[in-house]
Every structure is written in C-alpha cells, then in structure tokens.
C-alpha cells in the first residue's frame, strides 16, 4: 500500500467514523460507507488540507470511491 493510499484511507476512517477494514479501494463513500453530502464535503476539505492541494467542485463531485480519491491525489498532489 502506498503512502498516499494509507493517508487517504486514514482520512476516510477519521472523517466518516468507519472501521479501517470497511475502507477498501472500491468502497463508495455514500453507498458503502454511509456518507451524506456534508460528509463528502468535509472529506474533500480534509484531503485538500492533508495533501496541500485544491480540489475544484466539479472534480470533487466525480470522487465517489476511495480509489478515485487515491487516483486524484496521485495525479494532483504535491506531497
């Protein structure tokens, strides 16, 4: 597991209050992890802060699974 993947999963666990083993790469934030729209906004903000990047709203709307978040961060983050 990459450092980015670990960090993304840790943020998901903290933000959504779910168990680590529930946070699989294919897990959907809404369907599998029970997030609502406010949770997803807070999750995006936490990812932006952790990885020092800006995630535009139109991009954030496309990030619906753990893997999509990992892929976005891999493509756009500085650290």
Swiss-Prot record:
PROSITE patterns: CARRIER, PHOSPHOPANTETHEINE. Residues 2-77 form the Carrier domain. Belongs to the acyl carrier protein (ACP) family. GO terms for biological process: lipid A biosynthetic process. One of its GO terms (cellular component) is cytosol. It is found in: Cytoplasm. Pathway: Lipid metabolism; fatty acid biosynthesis. It comes from the Bacteria. Carrier of the growing fatty acid chain in fatty acid biosynthesis. 4'-phosphopantetheine is transferred from CoA to a specific serine of apo-ACP by AcpS. This modification is essential for activity because fatty acids are bound in thioester linkage to the sulfhydryl of the prosthetic group. Its main location: cytoplasm. Pfam families: PP-binding. The modification O-(pantetheine 4'-phosphoryl)serine is found at residue 37. Keywords: Cytoplasm, Fatty acid biosynthesis, Fatty acid metabolism, Lipid biosynthesis, Lipid metabolism, Phosphopantetheine, Phosphoprotein. InterPro entries: ACP, ACP-like_sf, PP-bd_ACP, Ppantetheine_attach_site. Transmembrane segments: none annotated. One of its GO terms (molecular function) is acyl binding. Gene3D superfamilies: ACP-like. It comes from Thioalkalivibrio sulfidiphilus (strain HL-EbGR7). This is Acyl carrier protein.
């Amino acid at each position: 597991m990459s450092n980015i993947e670990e960090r993304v999963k840790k943020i998901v666990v903290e933000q959504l209050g779910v168990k680590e083993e529930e946070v699989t790469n294919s897990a959907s934030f809404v369907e599998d992890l029970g997030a609502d729209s406010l949770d997803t906004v807070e999750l995006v903000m936490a990812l932006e802060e952790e990885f020092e990047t800006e995630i535009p709203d139109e991009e954030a709307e496309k990030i619906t699974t753990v893997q999509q978040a990992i892929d976005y961060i891999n493509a756009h983050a500085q650290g």
